[in-house]
Amino acid sequence: MDYEGLKDQWSDVEDRDGIRLSWNTFPSSRMEASRLVVPIGAIYTPLKERPDAPLLQYEPVTCKAPCRAVLNPYANVDVRARIWICPFCLMRNPLPPHYKDITESTIPPELHPLSTTIEYQLARPAPAPPIFVFVVDTCQEDDSLKAVKDSLILSLSLLPPNALVGLITFGTMAQVHELGYTECAKSYVFRGSKDYNAKQVQEMLGLASGIRPNMPNMPQQPVRPPLGAAARFLLPVQQAEFQITNMLEQLQRDPWPVANDKRPLRCTGVALNVAVGLLESSFQNAGAHIMLFTSGPATEGPGLVVSPELKEPIRSHHDIDRDNIKYYKKALKFYDALAKRAANNGHVVDLFAGCLDQVGLLEMKNLANYTGGHILLTDSFTSSQFKQSFIRVFDKDANDNLLMGFNASLEVLTTKELKVTGLIGHAVSLNKKSSSVGETECGIGNTCAWKMCGIDPSSSYGIYFEIANQGGPAAVQPGPQRGMMQFLTYYQHSSGHFHLRVTTVARNLSGPAGDPTLAQSFDQEAAAVLMARIGVFKAEVDDGPDVLRWVDRMLIRLCSRFADYRKDDPTSFRLEKNFTLYPQFMFHLRRSQFLQVFNNSPDETAFYRHVLNHEDVGDSLIMIQPTLDSYSLEHEGSLPVLLDSASIQPTHILLLDTFFHILIFHGETIAEWRKAGYQDQEGYENLKALLDLPKEDARELISERFPLPRFIVCDAGGSQARFLLSKLNPSTTHTTGGYGGGVSSQTIFTDDVSLQTFMDHLMKLAVSGTS
C-alpha cells in the first residue's frame, strides 16, 4: 500500500479508536526495537467523540484474574462450547448465560470486527452528583471581579440540576461561604498567613465529627454524617440557584487597604488548601472540580510566590537558571502536595488566570497537571478570550450531558511481546504492577494504571512501550504474529453512572531482521508528537541545551538508520515519503516555545507545555509547526504555503494558526490599499471579498478550539507582525543578501539557522555515521 493509502487507513483508525501509533508494525525482538530510535508509542484519546457508536447497557465480560482483559473482536469464540479464549493470556473462559443465543451470524456488538472501541454503562452509580467549588480572588479591580461574577452566574445555568456548588473567596483572608444559611450572608474565615493542615480545616468547618464548630458536644446528640455537615457549604444548583446568584452578586472587593508600593495580600495557597480539605472530608472518590479564578500572584501565607513589595519582581526564567529564587521551591512543594491530595481523592483543579503579569502558574501547574484540570492564561477576566473559553468548559453532548468525565482512570494490558514503559500526560501513577509493566521507564512509569481525575473528549495521553522478548520470534506459529494492547478507561459520566470505554489494538510483528514493513509502518506525525512529549518531560528536569542536544541526537540516529545514502556523501541522502516531514517537525520543535523559553515568562511556558500534553496528534502538530495559508487576487480561496519568510509577499494576505494565536497578516501593498479605502469603492468588490475571506476562515478555526486562541490582525512592518516572523523559517535574513528567496520576500533579522542549513548539517552528520 502506498503512503497516502496508509495515511488514510491510520486516519480511519484514529476516527474509530482515537489512537495513533508511532510504528504500525511492531518489531519482533528487543534488538530490532532498539534500532528504531523512536520508541513504540501511542497517542490515545480515550473519550474521542463517536456519535454513531452504541452505548452497551450491560456489564463487560472479563477474563479471569489476574488478566481481567475485556472480551473483544480479537478473542476466539467457540459458539457451540460457549467459551472464549482470551488473546492476552490464552485462558479459556465460559461465556455468561445471557450469551446463550449467539451464533456465527448473530454476535453481540463487542465481538463485531469494527468494535475495536466499545463503551459500557456500568451498573455502579456515582457516589455523589458532580461537584463544583468556585475559588474566587477578590483582590481585583471592580470590572474584573464583575466579569468573573457574571461568568459564574451564567455557568450555573449550564450545570446539571443536581450538581453541587460551593463558593470560597480569598484576599487577605480566605472565606468559605455557608450557602445553606439563608438568614444572612455567613462565612467561615481562615487567616491568610497560617498554614492549616487537613484536620484543622475540617474541624474549623465542623466536618471532622459532624458537629457545628463552637457548639458544646452534647453526649446524647447523635453524630451527624459528614455529608450532612458539608451540605451547608455545597448545595444543589436547582435548589439554591437563587442563593448562590445572590451571594455572587454581593461579592465585594477585598477591603484590606493596599499601599501604592505594595501588591495586594493574596492568600491563594490557603484558599486552595481549604477547598481541597472541604471536599476531602466528605467526597473522596466523588467527581469534583475546584475552579480557581486568580488575578495576581499569591503574596501571603503558604504557597506565596512573591513578596507584597512591588520593588521585588516575580521570578523569571533567568532567575530560575541562576537559582535566584527565594520562594519557588517552598511554593512548589506546597502546591505539589495539594495536587497529590486532590488527585488521590479524584478531584480536579482548574486554574483560570486573568492578569497581565504572572500569577504563579509555574508553581501551581501540577494542581492541573496531576488532576486533568484546565489551565487558562488570559490578560483579563473582562476579555472575550476568558469568557468564551470558560463557557466552553461546560459544553454538552446531544443528550444534554456535560462533555466531561470525572474521577477517571486508565489501565493498559498487553500481550507477552509488549510491555508498557510509561505515560506522559495529565495523570498520576496508581502504582499497579502487572505482567504488562516494562523494565525501563518513560514518563510516569513502573505501573500499568494511572488516575486522570478530569477527562474530556480532547484529553490525549502519550503511552510508551518496549518489546519484551530478547531473541527472534519464539515458537513459530502459522500466519503473521500479532502484538496486542488493550486500554480500559473507567470514568464517572455526568449522567451519574460509571462508564468503561475499551479500546483493543492489534498490530503485526515484523518478520526477520531488516523487514521493510517496519520502516513503511512509521507514522511521522504521531512520532513527532510522542517525541515532543518526551522532550517537554525532559525539559522539566534537565537544562534546555541538553534537551535540544537530545532532540538532535535522536533525529540524526533516525536518519542514519532509515535514509538511503552512500557513506560520507551528503548529496546522496534520500528519505522515504513517510519520513520526509519528520526532520522539519524537529526543526520547528527545537525553535518552539515548548523548548525555547526566551521571550516567554515561566507562567507562559507552564501553560504552553500543559496544553501540548493535553491535545491529540493534529492539534499538537499545529503547535509544533504552525499552518500558514495565503490569499491573493490571483487565486480563489486559500492556498497552504511554506512556513517560510519567502511566503511573505506584498500582494498577499497570510493566515497563521499557531493553535494559541490566529493571526491575519496583510502584505505591504494590500495594507496600503486597505488604508486608502479601496475596498469600499465601487469596482473593488474583489478586494473587499479578499479582505473578508481570511476573517471567515479564522472565525471557523476559533469556533471549535479550547482554549480560545488570541486573534491578531496586523500589517507588514507593524509591531504585532513579530508573532508571525518569530514562527517563520528564516530563509531570507540580513546575512543571506539577495540570494535567498525572492526580492519581494521579507528579511528576518535573526541569528537562528534556517531549515536549509539545518538539513545540510543533518545530512552531513547522518551519512558520516556519527551521532
From Swiss-Prot:
Coiled coil: none annotated. The keyword DNA damage does not apply. Transmembrane segments: none annotated. Zn(2+) binds at C63, C67, C86, C89. It holds the Pfam family Sec23_trunk. CDD domains: Sec23-like, Sec23_C. It is found in: Cytoplasm; Cytoplasmic vesicle, COPII-coated vesicle membrane; Endoplasmic reticulum membrane; Golgi apparatus membrane. It comes from the Eukaryota. The keyword RNA-binding does not apply. GO terms for molecular function: GTPase activator activity; zinc ion binding. It is a peripheral membrane protein. Keywords: Cytoplasm, Cytoplasmic vesicle, Endoplasmic reticulum, ER-Golgi transport, Golgi apparatus, Membrane, Metal-binding, Protein transport, Transport, Zinc. GO terms for biological process: COPII-coated vesicle cargo loading; intracellular protein transport. Its main location: cytoplasm. GO terms for cellular component: COPII vesicle coat; cytoplasm; endoplasmic reticulum exit site; endoplasmic reticulum membrane; Golgi membrane. SUPFAM superfamilies: beta-sandwich domain of Sec23/24, C-terminal, gelsolin-like domain of Sec23/24, Helical domain of Sec23/24, vWA-like, Zn-finger domain of Sec23/24. Component of the coat protein complex II (COPII) which promotes the formation of transport vesicles from the endoplasmic reticulum (ER). The coat has two main functions, the physical deformation of the endoplasmic reticulum membrane into vesicles and the selection of cargo molecules. The COPII coat is composed of at least 5 proteins: the sec23/24 complex, the sec13/31 complex, and the protein sar1. Belongs to the SEC23/SEC24 family. SEC23 subfamily. This is Protein transport protein sec23.
